[in-house]
């Protein structure tokens, strides 16, 4: 082999092999249309993985990372940002029911030791969202306005579910189990069901609905600001607190235990007293 050719060929070949290795390490086992990845040798440096996804309409998370959802009129997608080791631990797939399942391949108590779990972020987008199920320690944040027919939210872990922008839907169901929190900014719906079991907190900054059923069982807190709502039924079991304020057409309260249902800031527009 020509020596000049050998000297120029070998570095190029090694560079090509290195680039192929980096791309393979970045890939997840799930099928995808496109991949963009940037990996570096230092496992604590930032890595970004982007992929287009097939259509999905629900999210289920199990892991110690934060998920940010955006409703879009474009194709569904996922983007993961964080340290290389953390990013490569994230797994995802879309099941036959259209649920995007996001988890971690190697999660244990010491996985984020010495690092902030909030530095691992998963950004997802889809035209529709009808359900959120979270069983991990991370947060799920809906960062865009959301318009949907039916939305079911289930939080079974220690993380939070947060809506930063208005939510419009026909039916809304929110269930919290454990120590997690739910924060909804502005909700407009026909019927709403809010349930809290445990020691978590639920806050609805503004709720306008024809009918709302609110139930608390445990030591948690539910705070709801009502905006010209229809009928509100509130039931409390245990030592928790339900606080209702704003304006409604009718309200019914039932309390079992030593907890408190505070209606001192609630105005019933028909002149009816809370009962």
Where are these regions (language model features)?
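Acidic (Asp/Glu) and glycine-rich low-complexity loops/linkers
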Residues: 4-9, 24-135, 139-155, 164-173, ...
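Generic hydrophobic alpha-helical membrane-segment signal
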Residues: 11-13, 51, 145, 166, ...
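Bacterial N-terminal signal peptides
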Residues: 11-21
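Short helix-to-loop capping/linker segments positioned immediately adjacent to catalytic or ligand/cofactor-binding
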Residues: 139-142, 159-163, 179-184, 201-203, ...
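Short, surface-exposed interaction patches in beta-rich subdomains
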Residues: 171, 182-275
